[in-house]
């Protein structure tokens, strides 16, 4: 069943209250995890600190696979923030959804193309910013005409394509997962006991698969961000 989004108008702009709520909740969860993992740092990490150090090592590996550490080390915090934020955002809509008066309030924020495309624009914008900052404006602009000048239009198209695919890939995977979970839940509620029994196992299987997909998508989003960053800031690209 399709549910409306809770929208409000303010100063001629339309705001999706569900997106705003879920973005805030995602940010709070990531912040709480970060604080819990760094409150009492120890030489021998345990618990949350051990988990956070594993995340840092994992993202460090992503960066090292795309650019040299001297160049990419400054993006470690960005990568850790991205992978944690996208992962948490992908997971929020899996256990349940909340509908009030036909409006969908609780969902994964990344199941909305507006959110994922905004994230994509932000990270691609950052790659351009650091490209200019680290290479200088003239050298950065010359990259669009290398190795030959007639590639310039294609490279402009590539920038738009990278932004669209980065955002829409994440949206499509998460949105499709939540739609199927909603259909299975409807089967369980509309067809009595038999429907509930018949939907239970597929729901559990699909939720497990959605956790896997959400994790992979967080990795892909972070990896592609670092790939795009390497293309802009590394002198050998």
Curated annotation (Swiss-Prot):
Q: Which CDD domains match?
A: ATP-synt_Fo_a_6 (cd00310)
Q: Name one GO biological process term.
A: proton motive force-driven plasma membrane ATP synthesis
| Cellular compartments per GO CC | plasma membrane; proton-transporting ATP synthase complex
What keywords would UniProt list here?
ATP synthesis, Cell membrane, CF(0), Hydrogen ion transport, Ion transport, Membrane, Transmembrane, Transmembrane helix, Transport
Molecular function in Gene Ontology: proton-transporting ATP synthase activity, rotational mechanism
Task: Write out the annotated subcellular location.
Answer: Cell membrane
Q: What superkingdom heads the lineage?
A: Bacteria
Q: Membrane-spanning regions, if any?
A: 17-37, 75-95, 112-132, 179-201, 214-234
Q: Which InterPro entries match?
A: ATP_syn_F0_a_bact/chloroplast, ATP_synth_F0_asu, ATP_synth_F0_asu_AS, F0_ATP_A_sf
Provide the membrane topology annotation.
Answer: Multi-pass membrane protein
Q: What does this protein do?
A: Key component of the proton channel; it plays a direct role in the translocation of protons across the membrane.
Q: Which NCBIfam families match?
A: ATP_synt_6_or_A (TIGR01131), PRK05815.1-4 (NF004479)
Q: How does it assemble?
A: F-type ATPases have 2 components, CF(1) - the catalytic core - and CF(0) - the membrane proton channel. CF(1) has five subunits: alpha(3), beta(3), gamma(1), delta(1), epsilon(1). CF(0) has three main subunits: a(1), b(2) and c(9-12). The alpha and beta chains form an alternating ring which encloses part of the gamma chain. CF(1) is attached to CF(0) by a central stalk formed by the gamma and epsilon chains, while a peripheral stalk is formed by the delta and b chains.
Report the family membership: Belongs to the ATPase A chain family.
Q: Which PANTHER family match?
A: ATP SYNTHASE SUBUNIT A, CHLOROPLASTIC
Name assigned to this protein: ATP synthase subunit a
Q: Which organism is it from?
A: Geobacillus kaustophilus (strain HTA426)
Instruction: Show the taxonomic lineage.
Output: Bacteria, Bacillati, Bacillota, Bacilli, Bacillales
